[in-house]
Amino acid sequence: MARITVDDCLKRIPNRFDLTLAAAYRARQIANGAQLLIDSNAGSKDKPTVVALREIAAGQIGREVLERAIRS
């Protein structure tokens, strides 16, 4: 499994603070049982934070997570 770096994720969400908030929010969703948006085999061994970063790097999750969190 390839390592996910912050630089991979910053290509999708350029602001480090927004990236941190989005990854933390998505990791919390995953930990609470949300459906994974990437290959489920990869997520079975990884912690929710790593899965969230993989989703961001793959372009499956972006700033819209933060916008939804603010509205709710």
From Swiss-Prot:
A GO biological process held by the record: DNA-templated transcription
Keyword Disulfide bond among UniProt keywords: no
TM helices/strands, residue ranges: none
Domain of life: Bacteria
GO cellular component: DNA-directed RNA polymerase complex
EC number in record: 2.7.7.6
Family in the record: Belongs to the RNA polymerase subunit omega family.
Quaternary structure note: The RNAP catalytic core consists of 2 alpha, 1 beta, 1 beta' and 1 omega subunit. When a sigma factor is associated with the core the holoenzyme is formed, which can initiate transcription.
Function, as annotated: Promotes RNA polymerase assembly. Latches the N- and C-terminal regions of the beta' subunit thereby facilitating its interaction with the beta and alpha subunits.
Protein name in the entry: DNA-directed RNA polymerase subunit omega
Source species taxonomy: Bacteria, Pseudomonadati, Pseudomonadota, Betaproteobacteria, Neisseriales
